[in-house]
C-alpha cells in the first residue's frame, strides 16, 4: 500500500515526492531507483533530514500512534491509513496532538473517494431515493498476509461503518455482531453484524477474510427503490420501485408493497480512489481547507468497530 502512495505522490503536479521510509531495505532500494528519491529505514531520520510538509503513514496499525505523534511533533501534516489507531485512547491522543499543533490530520477511508460512492451521495442528497430504509455492505475476500496485528473487524469494518455514517448522515445507536475465528486463530476472521441508526435506518455488514474471491458491494434500500454499488468495478445501479416513483405507494403498499420498475446504470468518470484521496489531502494542506475525512471520523469508525468486537465476544447488543 505504501508503494501506491509513493506512486501517486510522484505523479502529482501539486506535490513532490521527496523521500520514503521502510524497514525493508529491498523495498527502499526499489523505490529509490523507481522515483529517484531518498529512502530511509528510520522514518525519524527522514523527518529530521527532509523536513517534509506532509506525510502518509502506511504502517501496521499497532504503530500508527507512535509514528503519527512523531510526525506531528515535527510539524508535519499527517494522513493515516485506516484505522486511525489500535485503540480509542490512542486515537484521542493523536487527534488532540494535531489540534494543539494546528496541523491537518486526515484518515484514509478510501471508499469515500470511489467515484461510484460520490455519485451515489449526490443522488441521496437530492432525495432521489426518498426515505432510506437500510444500508447493507459486503466486504469479503481472502486473508491478506500483510495483516498480523488486528482482526477483520478493526481492519475492514471501519471502511463500511464510515460509509454508512457518510451516506446516512446519522450515527448508530446500537450494534449486534456475531464473529468467528474459523482459520486465523489469533483474531476473528468473520463478522456478521446489524446496526440501528438514530434516524431509523438499519444496516447490515457481512465481512470476512474467508471468501476465495473479492466481493465489495454497497446496497442502499429506500422508498423509491435501491441503489447498488460494486466497489471493485466502480459501477452504480438504481433499481426502481415503480409504485413509489409513480405516486401510488400509499394506496397500494398494503397489497403489493413494491413493484419492479426500470434499472439504470449510471455513467460517470472512473478514477483511482487513492489518487482522489491524496489529491484532496494535498489541496487541504496547500489551501488551508478542512480535510474531507477528519480524525473525529476515524475515531467514530474505530469506536463503532470496537463495539462490534465487544458484541461478538459477549454475544450482547451494545448501546452506543
Q: Can you name each region flagged by the protein language model?
A:
Residues 54-59, 280-320:
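C-terminal helix-rich "cap/oligomerization" subdomain common to oxidoreductases
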Residues 1-35:
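N-terminal Rossmann-like dinucleotide-binding module
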Residues 79, 85-147:
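A contiguous active-site-proximal alpha/beta segment in oxidoreductase catalytic domains
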Residues 19, 53-54, 134:
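Short, Asp-centered acidic motifs that coordinate Mg2+ and/or phosphate
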Residues 5, 35-97:
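Beta-loop-alpha module in the N-terminal Rossmann-like domain of NAD(P)-dependent dehydrogenases
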Residues 161-241, 268-271, 275-289:
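Contiguous beta-strand/loop segments that form the cofactor/metal-binding neighborhood of enzyme cores
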Residues 113-134, 154-180, 194-201, 311:
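Oxidoreductase and adenylate-handling cofactor-binding alpha/beta cores
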Amino acid at each position: 500500500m505504501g508503494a501506491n502512495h509513493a506512486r501517486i505522490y510522484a505523479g502529482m503536479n501539486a506535490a513532490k515526492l521527496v523521500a520514503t521510509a521502510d524497514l525493508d531495505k529491498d523495498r527502499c532500494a526499489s523505490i529509490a531507483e523507481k522515483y529517484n528519491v531518498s529512502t530511509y529505514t528510520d522514518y525519524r531520520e527522514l523527518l529530521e533530514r527532509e523536513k517534509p510538509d506532509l506525510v502518509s503513514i502506511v504502517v501496521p496499525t499497532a504503530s500508527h500512534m507512535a509514528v503519527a505523534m512523531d510526525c506531528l511533533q515535527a510539524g508535519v501534516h499527517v494522513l493515516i491509513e485506516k484505522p486511525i489507531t489500535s485503540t480509542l485512547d490512542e486515537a484521542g491522543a493523536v487527534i488532540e496532538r494535531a489540534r494543539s499543533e494546528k496541523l491537518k490530520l486526515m484518515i484514509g477511508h478510501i471508499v469515500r473517494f470511489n467515484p461510484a460512492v460520490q455519485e451515489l451521495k449526490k443522488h441521496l442528497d437530492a432525495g432521489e431515493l426518498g426515505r432510506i430504509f437500510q444500508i447493507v455492505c459486503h466486504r469479503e475476500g481472502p486473508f491478506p498476509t500483510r495483516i498480523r496485528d488486528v482482526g477483520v473487524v478493526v481492519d475492514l469494518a471501519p471502511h463500511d461503518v464510515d460509509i454508512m455514517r457518510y451516506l446516512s448522515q446519522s450515527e448508530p445507536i446500537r450494534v449486534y455482531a456475531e464473529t468467528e475465528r474459523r482459520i486465523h486463530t489469533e483474531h476473528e476472521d468473520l463478522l456478521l453484524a446489524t446496526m440501528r441508526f438514530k434516524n431509523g435506518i438499519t444496516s447490515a455488514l457481512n465481512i470476512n477474510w474467508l471468501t476465495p474471491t473479492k466481493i465489495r458491494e454497497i446496497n442502499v434500500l429506500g422508498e423509491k427503490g435501491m441503489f447498488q454499488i460494486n466497489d471493485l468495478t466502480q459501477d452504480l445501479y438504481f433499481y426502481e420501485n415503480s409504485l413509489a416513483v409513480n405516486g401510488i405507494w400509499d394506496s397500494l403498499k398494503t397489497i403489493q408493497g413494491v413493484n419492479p420498475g426500470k434499472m439504470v446504470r449510471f455513467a460517470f468518470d472512473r478514477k483511482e480512489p487513492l489518487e482522489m484521496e491524496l489529491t484532496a489531502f494535498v489541496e487541504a494542506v496547500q489551501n488551508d481547507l478542512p480535510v474531507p475525512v477528519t480524525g473525529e471520523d476515524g475515531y467514530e469508525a474505530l469506536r463503532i468497530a470496537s463495539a462490534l468486537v465487544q458484541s461478538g465476544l459477549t454475544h450482547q447488543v451494545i448501546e452506543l
